[in-house]
Structures are given as C-alpha cells and as structure tokens.
C-alpha cells in the first residue's frame, strides 16, 4: 500500500512541496504519495486526528499551524522545542513526533557559498520572526564572531536575542544603525517578506556600505532574485537566494520520513521551473 505524506496549511494552493516530494519519491522508487491539505485554524485538531487515523507517515507544517500543532503531538524533538515551532511531523510507531528543519536547512544552503567556517564570520540578520528565530538559533550553535539583529520593532528583536543567553556577541539595531555599520558584516541575511511578490521593488535596507567580500542572503524565493539580491549582484557581492533554504529544509524532512536522501539539485530545478525563473 502506498505510504502517504503531505503538507498542511492555509493558504496551501500554490505550495510547491507536492512537486518536489512526489518527484523524489518516484526517483528513489518509493511507493508513496505527497498531497497538499488545506486546513483552517479551527480544524487543526481534527486534521491531526485524521493524520493518525489514516496512517499518514509524514507531514510538513506551514502557516498558520507551526506553533499550534505542538499541542496535538505526542513528542517534540529538541530541534523544535528550542524554536517553539514545528515544520515537520514524523510517525514513529503509533506516535506523532514534531521536528523543525528550517534552521538546519538554511545553514546547509549557506555553507555552499561560504569560504570560511561560521566561527570566523560576523552576521547581520534583518527580521525577527519565525524564520529568523530558526536561523539565529542554528547559526549561534556554531559560535560566530558576532551576530546582530535589526528589525523595525526593536523589542521583538531583543526577545529573539534572549533565546540564546549563553551567546554574548550580539546586538539589537535599528535599520538605520545597521546601514551605518554594514561594512562590519561578512554575511547579511534578510528574513522578512519585504521584496516578495507582488512588491518586488521593495528592499529592507540599503547595501551602500556593505563590505566588498560580504555574502547577501534572502530567504524570499518569489521572485528568485529579489531587489535586494539584484543590488548585491550589481555591487559584485556573492548572493544566496531563498530557493536554497526551501529545498534543503524539504530534503531534511524527506530524509526524516524515508531514511533516504533526495536529489537536491533536481528539487531546486523543479522549484525554479515552477517559478518560471533562472538561477541568480
């Protein structure tokens, strides 16, 4: 009998997860199917009961359920406990266990463009939401030289820095302060929705003072090359688009469910094809 996998969220109609996971199942000769399920917030508990009853082997969790689903699972892995959010659920016997692959997915994509270890680099992150939390806590485990956060709401950024009390080389900045200090950073990571379709001309901050050796990352992947990444490319800076994080976190979920490693480059090609884009 086919094993069933899927993604739950709302909205979910434009999810590319079924495309990449079904292609990976087919490539590896695994008898399974991955389906997108639209689940309203007030239907989440019933949806989890359905997942149990139907014997679903694995589920990805997206907006708005990443936090609330934790109430309905049997166990939460340390990766998700630290973040206070779940993006992957795996059936383990008769138990449903929650994981989070977002932070590790970003770091895996980042490591492909770095020429130094994280411990030798200074980071600036723009944003303090759920994705920012995953990225910050994962990178900090690798003890960077410095990791500052800038956000429109300083209090929200401050709360995020407090999630890692043992890491001290961190500071909360306004956007203006970050722009003035930009030359200090080796890696600049944008984690908000600024520049996402349809507002494709928006940028979160100016890269005017960025160091010539800086790497600029944007987790937005629609468009693939955001206005921020275009500005970085025009300055001759190395860039990392959001497709990398999306594909790497998906691959980690796939491995959790099947024990097998999917073809990352094929996943990436599918996503780029669906977006109608080209590589940066």
UniProtKB/Swiss-Prot annotation:
Top-level taxon in the UniProt lineage: Bacteria
Keywords annotated in UniProt: Amino-acid biosynthesis, Aromatic amino acid biosynthesis, NADP, Oxidoreductase
One Pfam family it belongs to: SDH_C
Substrates-to-products reaction catalysed: shikimate + NADP(+) = 3-dehydroshikimate + NADPH + H(+)
Active site: 66 (proton acceptor)
Record carries keyword Transferase: no
Residues engaged in binding NADP(+): 78, 127-131, 151-156, 219, 242
One term of GO molecular function: shikimate 3-dehydrogenase (NADP+) activity
GO biological process: amino acid biosynthetic process; aromatic amino acid family biosynthetic process; chorismate biosynthetic process; shikimate metabolic process
Binding positions for shikimate per the UniProt entry: 15-17, 62, 87, 102, 221
Protein name per its UniProtKB record: Shikimate dehydrogenase (NADP(+))
Coiled coil stretches, renumbered: none
Annotated TM spans: none
GO CC, alphabetical: cytosol
InterPro entries attached to this UniProt entry: Aminoacid_DH-like_N_sf (IPR046346), NAD(P)-bd_dom_sf (IPR036291), SDH_C (IPR041121), Shikimate_DH (IPR011342), Shikimate_DH-bd_N (IPR013708), Shikimate_DH_fam (IPR022893), Shikm_DH/Glu-tRNA_Rdtase (IPR006151)
Family: Belongs to the shikimate dehydrogenase family.
Subunit note: Homodimer.
EC numbers for this chain: 1.1.1.25
Pathway info: Metabolic intermediate biosynthesis; chorismate biosynthesis; chorismate from D-erythrose 4-phosphate and phosphoenolpyruvate: step 4/7
Biological function: Involved in the biosynthesis of the chorismate, which leads to the biosynthesis of aromatic amino acids. Catalyzes the reversible NADPH linked reduction of 3-dehydroshikimate (DHSA) to yield shikimate (SA).
UniProt keyword Amino-acid biosynthesis present: yes
